[in-house]
Every structure is written in C-alpha cells, then in structure tokens.
C-alpha cells in the first residue's frame, strides 16, 4: 500500500513539474534562490560576527550549513519516494564520501573564503565562469555527445569577456586572493561534475547528494573547529539566515532534480542567467554594495547572454 501511495505521489509530482509554465516559473525561482546564496552568506558573516580574516569560523559556518542541507535531502527522499535513501556500501560508499570531500569540502572552503573578500557583484561574475568551463570540459570529456557548437563557443567568448570586463579597474571589488579562491572553487566545481554524474549511476541520487553534503559539511566543520573557529554571536536573524542557506542547498537539489527529470534540459538550463542578476541586486539590497558600476553592468550583460547561449544551444540541436 505504501509503495502504491508513493508511486501515485511521484506520478502527480512528475505531471506538475512537467507542465511547461510551472517548470519555467520554478526554474526561475530555483536560480533566484541560488543567486541569493552569495549575499546571504555575506550577511551571515555579519550576523554571526565573523571577520573576513577568520577562516576557521568561516569554515564552521559553511560546515553547519551543508550538514543541515543534507538533512533536507533526506526529508526530500521521504516526501518524494516514501522512504529514506538506501546508502551504498563498500567502494561506492567510499567514492561518495570522497566526492563530498572534493565537491563540498574543497570547493566551498575556497568559495566561502572568497565570499568574505569579494563584493557580491564581482564574486558572482567570477563564479559564472563555471558555466563556460563546464561547456569546454564537456567537449573533451563526452565527445560527440556534447560537442562544442558555434552558439556555445560564442557564449563562452562573451562569458569570459564579461569576466574580463568585471576585472578591469577592480575598484574595491576584491583582493587578489579572493579572486584566486573563487576561480579555484569554480575549477573544482567543474571537475566534480563528471565525477558526480558517474557516481549517481552507481547509487541512489538522494543517497549520493546526502553523503556529498554531509561528509563535506562535517569535514568543513571539523577543520574549522580544529583551527579554533566558532560562531561568535548567535541571534534569531543569524539562525534564520543559516536555515535559509541550508534550504537552498538541500531543497534546491530536490527541486532541480524534479525539473531535470521531467523537462528537456534546454527548457530549464537557459534560466541560469537569473543567478548572477539576483546576486547583484540582493548584494546591493542586503549588504549595501554598489549596484551601477559600469564594469559590473557591462560584465553582467555579457555573462547573462553567454549563459543563455551555452544552454540554448542544445535546444537548437534537438530541433534538427
């Protein structure tokens, strides 16, 4: 009876998330949530009284977020599948844990350090390079299955041009180490993509995501604590900020998985341009950062067009 109820629930969700109008609206909202992460992380540092140079406390903050997010992934599995995910065993379990140490721990150790040292606009522009690096890596990794096309190539050129424009005359946008850390986090994210895809073929996707977030988050927290980190000031506003960030990484995964399952990739992925736009506007609204610096506006336009082009290309291929 439980299996029948779970199957019926899953079927209803598939129908709902497969509805074009609903899917587009949710894809925009999902990207808006991810775009809000940078300014909310930065606001979290302020609410918890974490100094930009306090790397240990920054790692503790990141670790708690991802561990909480992993619990939301478990909740998503219960709601959508009617059960907790079956954890893999042996080598696959070890591989999932290793993925967490790489994709969550290593990537976000650099990412969270960069957030402390960069403005939201500049950090978002730098972080957008993951869209273009992913396209380039896919061309060499997957061959004919994901070839570079003229539209993708143009998108990459415009995207990297946007990053260059954003870097020109970097008036207080961020330190050299902040730039390096963000770009390194982007490279780690891009390299983790094919590995993540490979692991999810060997185990339940919810289990893979749970272990990724939990193991990586626990490693960040333990490293931070070992370095003497702590959350200096706990307030209701700070807790709310942390819970929202946990929701983004946990529930965001579940929502995106449903969208990708029930829609053509081209229908959903093109809305990635919403991410940096929301980042810039919320950074101005929540953290008082400048909104209309010419290099940021110009870079944002180029990056958004680039993201749209590299993700629109598959739709053109499907129509042939």
Give short role names for the model-derived ranges.
Residues 2-60, 171-198, 247, 282, ...:
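Glycine-/small-residue-enriched transmembrane alpha-helix faces in small-molecule transporters
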Residues 29, 33-53, 68, 108-118, ...:
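Juxtamembrane C-cap of transmembrane helices in multi-pass membrane transport proteins
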Residues 2, 47-103, 133-137, 188-192, ...:
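Transmembrane alpha-helices of multi-pass small-molecule transport proteins
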Residues 64, 104, 108, 122-131, ...:
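Helix-helix packing/entry segments at the starts of transmembrane helices
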Residues 19-24, 54-59, 88-93, 168-188, ...:
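Juxtamembrane helix-entry segments on the extracytoplasmic side of multipass membrane proteins
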Residues 31, 39-42, 73, 134-136, ...:
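Transmembrane alpha-helical segments that form core, pore/gating elements
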Residues 73, 137, 148-168, 273, ...:
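Hydrophobic transmembrane alpha-helices of multi-pass small-molecule transport proteins
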Residues 78-123, 127, 163-165, 245-263:
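Specific transmembrane alpha-helical segments of multi-pass solute transporters/efflux pumps
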